Regions:
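N-terminal membrane-targeting hydrophobic helices
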Residues: 1-166
Length: 166
């Protein structure tokens, strides 16, 4: 998927989370305000492609993109787990706004991985436990397939919001 698709899907998902939990999400003694996460979700949506030298993040961080293979470690569940731990630690330390920013960043990162799971190339989701790439669909990047994917993603989010708010 392209960077724009990742940003659209990540932001849409964060908007959906915000819509169904506008007053906050109580997790482990802290009430997270997902609306604050809207500030960081697009960055999180782009970050897994820091390993791709042609991507915006890869261009900004050439040292990293030069030494990592595309859809390698950055497309696993390892980073989202690290971000969840960081989010909980920031909440426990009572650092204002930071947990929400980490939450938004993490939502963007996870949505990026989920979107790439729908691409024929797949992702090494369970690396290092399982090194093979997995995919659940075969949408082609930079074709009309990608537009269909975006419409389906937006539709699922709208349906989830509608169902959860009724």
């Amino acid at each position: 998927m392209t960077g724009k698709t990742h940003a659209i899907c990540g932001t849409d998902t964060m908007l959906a989370i915000t819509a169904v939990s506008f007053r906050g999400l109580p997790i482990d003694g802290h009430t997270y305000l997902p609306a604050v996460g809207l500030l960081s979700v697009a960055a999180g949506s782009y970050m897994p492609d820091i390993d791709l030298h042609r991507s915006k993040m890869g261009q900004r961080h050439k040292f990293i993109s030069k030494h990592l293979t595309h859809r390698g470690i950055t497309h696993t569940l390892l980073f989202p787990v690290i971000f969840i731990v960081a989010m909980l630690m920031a909440a426990a330390a009572k650092i204002p706004v930071l947990p929400e920013l980490i939450m938004g960043f993490n939502v963007g990162w996870v949505v990026h991985i989920l979107a790439d799971l729908c691409n024929r190339k797949g992702v090494p989701l369970l690396w290092p436990l399982y090194r093979r790439r997995v995919h659940i669909a075969a949408f082609l990047t930079s074709t009309w397939h990608e537009y269909v994917f975006i419409i389906l993603w937006l539709g699922v989010n709208v349906a989830c919001v509608f169902f959860l708010l009724r």
